């Protein structure tokens, strides 16, 4: 054990009395992970406040230093959809609360708003593509009150039509939509909240429906995971989770149906004796789909297979912890390959650095089946807590009582392949995550990440599976809206490769085959790193429109794609300047990941480093003399490849 007496300006190691208070770093975001150096301190109570400040300052400096040194964070290029890419549709009135639905194999997009569902058909012109479905409250007696509106919060495709559910003046109800006509289905508790809010989940799995929405308005402070339809209705205990914020849920169907699981992802408040350390913990919870509730009267309507585990999104090189769960994207493996299902988690650190960590369902399943229970020091009962029962048997009361009192497993879920740091780390605050895995010839060889920022833009990251780099590269920023605004919802159509994204004002269709934005030469096409693009017929082309022989993943190196003469065409200018004058030469920054430098007669005149320059690389020619005469060359260096961009022949007047 280490002993520490801390001040704000300089932490000093000194020996204190063993009677002083013990601080474990689990209060900072994970046991032994705050600084990655010391697990436990004995702290004098008077030093507690200054110690917290010291630790926070050290961690902020560590995070900033690591973020600057390890990778280039900013997007390589920036594209505005108003430049002719994509399509836009406007709502008319402002819609502060929306839900987005896209019908597969069609160009239809539904947006649920206040008393209205908007239908946009992006295959037709904007003048003929909008339909309004009015679904006003059935209890609308006080029009001046927002609580008497009908905010649509759920759109779900069913065999008999589109299910739409809304707040309905605090009397949650649902409607069925067919061919723009609506049928009122009546009150449906658990499918819509009493008022619009985030963090409400509804999961449909075969004949069962799961929900985190409160069934009673008076229990607005209650947070439970429920099964509300299908098999017997069940809910989690009051003590199972501490003020959880639910993010995502999924069903995993295994080879033995009795062992099917429901996994839900959330963050919760952690118990801490030190209020200076606001502490949230990212979690995954599990229940068995076959759970029939308990045997006793106290457990008959409770989940008896609920367990929870911590998701460990950590950079072990720097000790940075990402403890706030923002979003989850689930990549579903093919049928009968459930263990290969991937969980992509978007996290924030306490200082608003973002990270994406990858977990596997196989690892999650292993942790729940093998880990001890946290703070439980006795032999586990048989069957062990969390185990699914065959033939719809009830979990024995003894097993339920242990799991109900000790629902957290001791082992965390680590990143895929025990990775030492997240696949993405960024200074940007990201809010939502989508993932597309690129497949050619039956092999996944690249992963594309779509991340939304708090400013309303989309960042696209790429990681090649066989790359020596373990992190993804930020290749593109997209501004999707005509009117800049935060992004409320985003959907991926991975069949037609479209993104659908909406704000409170508009919805946009973003094509993912943006190959033409990268330039009109092979070098620029290759340097984009976009796995969806290749050089074909003297054009940067969408790979799915090119044959495998010419556009497949074999064309990965610069020489393979572009040949030996890959350099772009050099732009040449001739300028004349007065003697003893000051002039500026500007070299365009065609990539935010490149270094630029001006040379003349083989000597470097000016360097613009990738981590410091923000715009064009400017060369100042001060007090021009005869030595100024000649050709000034702007060069670009990116990934060990150097090419000429610009030649300016300067003569004196």
UniProtKB/Swiss-Prot annotation:
Q: Boundaries of each Sema domain copy?
A: 76-512
Name a GO CC annotation attached to this entry: plasma membrane
Q: List the disulfide bonds.
A: 587-634
Please give the InterPro entries that the UniProt record associates with this protein: Ig-like_dom, Ig-like_fold, Semap_dom, Semap_dom_sf, Semaphorin, WD40/YVTN_repeat-like_dom_sf
Q: Which domain of life is it from?
A: Viruses
- Domain PSI: where? 514-563
Protein's GO biological process: integrin-mediated signaling pathway; positive regulation of cell migration; regulation of inflammatory response; semaphorin-plexin signaling pathway
Q: What GO MF annotations does this protein's record show?
A: chemorepellent activity; integrin binding; semaphorin receptor binding
Give the keywords, sorted: Disulfide bond
User: What Pfam families does the entry give?
Assistant: Sema
> What exactly does this protein do?
May act as an immune modulator in host-infected cells.
Its protein name is Semaphorin-like protein A3
Look up and give the organism this protein is from. Answer: Alcelaphine herpesvirus 1 (strain C500) (AlHV-1)
What is this protein's gene name? A3
